């Protein structure tokens, strides 16, 4: 018999390489074929619920790394909750209406303006449904477990019907109204935009200081050769000027410059003088802003007057303290105009071109008017200074073109009547990170009314009729009738039926004596679509629950979905749609740049999956602090792949060395485990407790860090490091070996369960090698936290031993550097411990020689010799061990040959072989 055959060498078919791109897809098919999502929910029926409501991504193109971060994060949470006993369904959603779909059709040469509206919308629907299927395939391939057969999609008939009911409730309560006011207007997409559809970019702009001649100063200042100085960054709005706004609390200086006088805010005088170039000026008078109200100036270009008004939005941050006010082109301007009954003059059309209301500018694009105004003011002698500067300006988030403020007639949702209720609901909700609460609170506190109408084709139509005299018709009966039609036919019914067919049978109105009605042409803002999903999905679907326990999206959704959902939910039910909000940062490259094709830094999840596997992306998510921006690059993903390899190889070692272990037959009770095995069991138990607590806080970064640290330090660098001397060398059924196998097997089971939400494919593969009752690890529950009575005592003593071990490893390294030894098993170590360390060693009563992986260990209770290395907890002498290397245990021993039956082996190995392989004692051994 060969010596090798007497060793208990580990064996496993669990491969070192995961072959993830191939194996993952096989697992996903198996999960789907065996209905694992449904099986898990069935196991948890009647248990406490956990409802994560999926914020719907827009259905357009393949998924990007931001999608992957979001969906994997949700999947980790839902998988954990299900394995921890919660009934945690997950219904994925898609946002499908809106401009991007129309843009894609335009690229194909389809013109919505020349096509029947219903047919055009059908093409939009087809495109959106194709995109949903494309993204669904991508999400499934990330290993996301969900109710893929029953997703919610904002174009579904029932969803659209319920959205109409949400609108109807808000209308009934008086929150919806029609009005004319300035809104974000995208000339590039010919529609209004919500705040959430606007992004800011730095652009160069003309800023001008303009002199408005004073014509009526109420007798307070001399109007002769006196000018109000305004500053604006939008010269193109000068034709629409109706007023000059001052802050009633500020002081204003009348400044003599040559033979002219100028009025500016006292607090900005020095800055303005420097900007314009007034070298020699003198303050001749100071007046209060409050006293300037109702003064008048002459428009420098047009035959009209400009009224001086008050406004607390006027600041001393920039400009002159006198604000050019055009009620048709700005929110603050509009509010001032309402107070003073000024005209809402907005002579720019949907394409950003001036109308015939300013004849000489008719047909000119507003940006061209910008340059023209500078020239005209210069020619009129009214331009005091032109300066080109860079500032942050709103752009359409889809077309990337600048937007303008433009007063148009729109439908609005007023939040003022229930703003306090919303703020109270924000206070009641929990936010991760905690600053999210303040951010959303301030947004709601400061936000104006929500413009909910859009001048587009692809969306849910505003369910409003108009009577013959133009009166809007919206009643509970008309709303429910339309909702029921949409439930059956979808919102395209609005375009395939006449107004009469869409109204309840026999409907009449005093405003339509002839019984004629027309339909509203505008559609609802897409944020109203997704913002009503709490009702169309969580409230109305069987098996789901409202309010949701968690909303999890990117931090841009504080002004998007978190915001719109909150408004509609509180408006209709009085409560927030979520109990908790978790926001994540954006995915950037490793240099902190946004991903873009022009920079060439785009990483596609599908490409990564083909090269490395979805598990590597999932591990990247688990390793990242997602509450702030998250970096990704091929280098970073390579680091995740290295972490994966470390985890996989550790599991391979554990599986190989427990392949002959059956927990029912060979398991050792905790009280019978060796001290070092109990210590590892306690460390494992503490890890379980820490990981469950971190999962409960949705902190899977901590889960991964704790597990990786345990695998790297507690297992690989310590327990499994000295395990070979037990697992390979000791008798197959010896207490020492079975004790250690008990712990290793337990660690494999518990680590597999805890890692399943993060690495489901790999953990499912590992589960197949464990002797556990559940067919799939996803059908198993998270490990329970045990209570060990000797927990504190063992942790303290073994903690002290680990400090001593550090000393020994240091001494061994020094001996290696001095060429005294090569490997640690060549060493004979003598320890002279301090009093506390000696007491610890006596208490633990363990095989420290084995644990330290040395051939000989002597502990001396006495004074250390001169040649001892003085370290933190002991003095240590390292020498080369005397004797020969035992070919079986590889230790240097002086007792080789003492057993005449097996003269090749040391006494320990000879005894083990005689017990386990009696035939070897008779026949002898060979190398």
Swiss-Prot record:
GO terms for molecular function: aminoacyl-tRNA deacylase activity; ATP binding; isoleucine-tRNA ligase activity; tRNA binding; zinc ion binding. Binds 1 zinc ion per subunit. A motif ('KMSKS' region) lies at residues 594-598. Its cofactor is Zn(2+). It is found in: Cytoplasm. CDD domains: Anticodon_Ia_Ile_BEm, IleRS_core. It catalyses: tRNA(Ile) + L-isoleucine + ATP = L-isoleucyl-tRNA(Ile) + AMP + diphosphate. InterPro entries: aa-tRNA-synth_I_CS, aa-tRNA-synth_Ia, Anticodon_Ile_BEm, Ile-tRNA-ligase, Ile-tRNA-ligase_type1, Ile-tRNA_ligase, M/V/L/I-tRNA-synth_anticd-bd, Rossmann-like_a/b/a_fold. Coiled coil: none annotated. Its EC number is 6.1.1.5. L-isoleucyl-5'-AMP binds at residue 553. ATP binds at residue 597. Zn(2+) binds at residues 886, 889, 906, 909. GO terms for biological process: isoleucyl-tRNA aminoacylation. It is an enzyme of class 6 (ligase). Catalyzes the attachment of isoleucine to tRNA(Ile). As IleRS can inadvertently accommodate and process structurally similar amino acids such as valine, to avoid such errors it has two additional distinct tRNA(Ile)-dependent editing activities. One activity is designated as 'pretransfer' editing and involves the hydrolysis of activated Val-AMP. The other activity is designated 'posttransfer' editing and involves deacylation of mischarged Val-tRNA(Ile). HAMAP family: Ile_tRNA_synth_type1. Monomer. This is Isoleucine--tRNA ligase. It comes from Lactobacillus acidophilus (strain ATCC 700396 / NCK56 / N2 / NCFM).
């Amino acid at each position: 018999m060969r010596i090798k055959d007497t060793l208990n060498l580990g064996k496993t078919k669990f491969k070192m390489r995961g072959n993830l791109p191939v194996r993952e897809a096989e697992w996903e098919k198996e999960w789907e074929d065996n209905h694992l999502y449904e099986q898990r929910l069935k196991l948890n029926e009647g248990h406490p619920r956990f409802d994560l409501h999926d914020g719907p991504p827009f259905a357009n193109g393949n998924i990007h790394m931001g999608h992957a971060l979001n969906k994997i994060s949700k999947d980790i949470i839902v998988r954990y909750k299900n394995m921890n006993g919660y009934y945690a369904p997950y219904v994925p959603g898609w946002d499908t209406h809106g401009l991007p779909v129309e843009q894609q059709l335009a690229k194909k040469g389809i013109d919505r303006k020349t096509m029947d509206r219903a047919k055009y919308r059908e093409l939009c629907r087809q495109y959106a449904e194709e995109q949903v299927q494309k993204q669904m395939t991508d999400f499934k391939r990330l290993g996301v477990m969900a109710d893929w057969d029953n997703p919610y999609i904002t174009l579904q008939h029932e969803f659209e019907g319920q959205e109409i009911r949400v609108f109807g409730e808000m209308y009934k309560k008086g929150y919806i109204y029609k009005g004319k006011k300035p809104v974000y207007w995208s000339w590039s997409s010919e529609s209004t935009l919500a705040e959430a559809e606007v992004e800011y970019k730095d652009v160069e702009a003309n800023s001008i200081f303009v002199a408005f001649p004073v014509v009526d100063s109420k007798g307070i200042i001399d109007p002769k050769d006196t000018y109000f100085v305004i500053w604006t960054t939008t010269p193109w709005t000068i034709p629409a000027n109706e007023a000059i706004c001052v802050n009633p609390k500020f002081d204003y200086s009348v400044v003599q410059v040559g033979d002219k006088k100028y009025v500016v805010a006292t607090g900005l005088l020095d800055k303005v003088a420097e900007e314009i170039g007034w070298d020699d000026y003198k303050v001749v008078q100071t007046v209060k802003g409050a006293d300037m109200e109702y003064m008048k100036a002459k428009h420098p270009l047009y035959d009209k007057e400009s009224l001086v008004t008050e406004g607390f939005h006027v600041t001393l941050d920039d400009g002159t303290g006198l604000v050019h006010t055009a009620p048709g082109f700005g929110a603050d301007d509009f509010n001032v105009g309402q107070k003073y009954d000024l005209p809402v003059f907005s002579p720019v059309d949907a394409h950003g071109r001036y109308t015939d209301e300013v004849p000489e500018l008719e047909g000119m694009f507003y940006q061209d008017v910008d340059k023209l105004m500078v020239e005209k003011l210069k020619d009129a002698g009214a331009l005091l200074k032109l300066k080109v500067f860079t500032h942050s300006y709103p752009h359409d988030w889809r077309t990337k073109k600048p937007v303008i403020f433009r007063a148009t007639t729109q439908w609005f949702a007023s939040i003022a009547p229930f703003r306090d209720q919303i703020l109270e609901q924000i206070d009641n909700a929990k936010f991760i990170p905690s600053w999210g609460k303040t951010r959303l609170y301030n947004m709601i506190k400061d936000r104006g009314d929500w413009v909910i109408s859009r001048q587009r084709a692809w969306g849910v139509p505003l369910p409003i009729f108009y009577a013959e005299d133009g009166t809007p018709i919206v009643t509970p009966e008309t709303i429910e009738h339309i909702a029921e039609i949409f439930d059956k036919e979808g919102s395209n019914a609005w375009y395939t039926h006449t107004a009469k067919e869409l109204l309840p049978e026999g409907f009449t109105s005093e405003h339509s004596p002839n019984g004629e009605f027309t339909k509203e042409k505008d559609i609802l803002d897409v944020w109203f679509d997704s913002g009503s999903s709490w009702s169309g999905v969580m409230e109305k679907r069987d098996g789901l629950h409202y309010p949701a326990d968690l909303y999890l999206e990117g931090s841009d959704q504080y002004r998007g979905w978190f915001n719109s959902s909150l408004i509609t939910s509180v408006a209709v039910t009085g409560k927030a749609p979520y109990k908790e909000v978790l926001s994540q940062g954006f995915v950037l490259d490793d240099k902190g740049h946004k991903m873009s094709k022009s920079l060439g830094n785009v990483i596609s999840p599908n490409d990564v999956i083909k090269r490395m596997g979805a598990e590597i992306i999932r591990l990247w998510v688990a390793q990242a602090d997602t509450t702030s921006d998250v970096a990704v690059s091929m280098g970073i993903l390579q680091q995740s792949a290295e972490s994966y390899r470390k985890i996989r190889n550790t599991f391979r070692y554990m599986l190989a060395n427990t392949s002959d272990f059956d927990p029912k037959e060979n398991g050792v009770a905790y009280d019978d485990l060796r001290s070092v095995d109990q210590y590892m069991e306690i460390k494992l138990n503490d890890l379980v407790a820490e990981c469950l607590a971190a999962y409960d806080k949705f902190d899977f970064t901590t889960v991964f860090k704790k597990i990786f640290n345990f695998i790297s330090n507690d297992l690989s660098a310590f327990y499994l490091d000295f395990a070979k001397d037990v697992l390979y060398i000791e008798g197959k059924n010896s207490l020492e070996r079975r004790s250690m196998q008990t712990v290793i097997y337990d660690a494999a089971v518990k680590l597999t369960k805890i890692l399943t939400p993060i690495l489901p494919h790999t953990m499912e593969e590992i589960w197949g090698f464990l002797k556990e009752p559940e067919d799939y690890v996803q059908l198993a529950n998270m490990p329970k936290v045990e209570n060990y009575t000797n927990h504190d005592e063992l942790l303290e003593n073994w903690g002290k031993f680990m400090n001593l071990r550090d000393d020994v490893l240091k001494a061994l390294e020094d001996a290696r550097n001095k060429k005294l030894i090569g490997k640690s098993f060549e060493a004979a170590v003598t320890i002279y411990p301090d009093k506390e360390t000696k007491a610890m060693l006596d208490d633990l009563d363990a095989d420290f020689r084995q644990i330290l992986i040395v051939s000989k260990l002597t502990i001396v209770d006495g004074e250390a010799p001169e040649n001892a290395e003085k370290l933190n907890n002991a003095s240590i002498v390292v020498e080369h061990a005397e004797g020969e290397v035992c070919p079986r245990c590889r230790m240097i021993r002086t007792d080789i040959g003492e057993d005449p039956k097996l003269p090749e082996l040391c006494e320990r190995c000879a005894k083990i072989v005689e017990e386990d392989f009696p035939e070897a004692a008779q026949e002898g051994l060979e190398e």
